[in-house]
Structures are given as structure tokens and as C-alpha cells.
């Protein structure tokens, strides 16, 4: 059934501006764009240890029931330093959605609203690190 995360999709009124903002944050440009990088309606980044995909889609293609206010499920991306990551996000225009919270030993979360209205969660998650270091099944 559910086999793994493939793509996290965010919406933006201005995909080109979101592309620039996320390129600055991630330190890498998108690897995929439609119809092109100059006037995109969709861009996709690969990031992290397992190259998960972050897609940014023009709001014109959002489902009719989609809200324009931040809300819904929060996807948390693992980071090694939540405080430093939140400070970086705030310095480039994000706003605090959920402040830094200690969730127990080895688990810290926080989330921000990006300049395009999406919630971006970050987390230090000891389980994530354990999974990365576990021997791979053959």
C-alpha cells in the first residue's frame, strides 16, 4: 500500500519567485520545470539524504476546495540543527508558525510559513538518523 513519500507539493501565486526563494534556501536549483525555468508553472527540487521531491505548483491549478490560508498537514524535514535552520528561514522572509518545541529526548520541531503561504516544518528526529544508519536489507 503506502510505500514511501514521493513528492511534497506546495502552492505559489508566483512560482518563479518561489523557485528563487527555495533555490536560495536549499542551495540548489530545481532539477525539473514546466514549461521552462524562465516562466514556470511547476518546479521540482530533490533534497535530503534520499532525494525526496519538493514540488511548487502555480495556485491556478489548486483543487477548488483548497484554502489560501496556511493549514492542514505539516511535513517535517529532518535537519541537524533546528535553531540554526529556523534562524536561516526567518532571515530570508519566513514567519514563525509553530515555535521551537522540545518533544522529548531526540525530538525537536518547529514550523514556518514561507513567503508564499505554505507551512514548512523542520525537525530533529533521532528515529530518522537511526533509519539512515541501519544496515540496508539485501
Model-identified regions with their sequence ranges:
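Generic beta-structure capping elements
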Residues: 48-50, 57-59, 125
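Core segments of cupin and vicinal oxygen chelate
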Residues: 2-3, 9-52
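A short, acidic/glycine-rich surface segment
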Residues: 31, 41, 56-66, 98, ...
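Vicinal oxygen chelate
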Residues: 1, 4-13, 33, 41-48, 64-138
Amino acid at each position: 500500500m503506502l510505500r514511501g513519500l514521493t513528492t511534497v507539493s506546495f502552492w505559489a501565486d508566483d512560482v518563479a519567485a518561489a523557485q528563487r526563494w527555495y533555490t536560495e534556501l536549499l542551495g540548489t536549483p530545481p532539477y525539473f520545470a514546466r514549461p521552462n525555468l524562465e516562466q514556470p508553472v511547476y518546479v521540482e527540487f530533490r533534497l535530503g539524504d534520499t532525494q525526496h521531491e519538493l514540488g511548487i505548483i502555480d495556485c491556478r491549478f489548486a483543487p477548488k476546495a483548497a484554502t489560501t490560508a496556511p493549514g492542514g498537514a505539516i511535513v517535517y524535514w529532518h535537519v541537524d540543527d533546528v535553531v540554526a535552520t529556523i534562524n536561516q528561514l526567518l532571515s530570508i522572509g519566513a514567519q514563525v508558525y509553530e515555535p521551537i518545541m522540545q518533544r522529548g529526548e531526540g525530538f525537536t520541531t518547529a514550523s514556518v510559513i514561507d513567503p508564499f503561504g505554505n507551512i514548512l516544518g523542520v525537525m530533529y528526529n533521532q528515529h530518522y538518523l537511526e533509519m539512515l544508519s541501519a544496515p540496508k536489507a539485501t
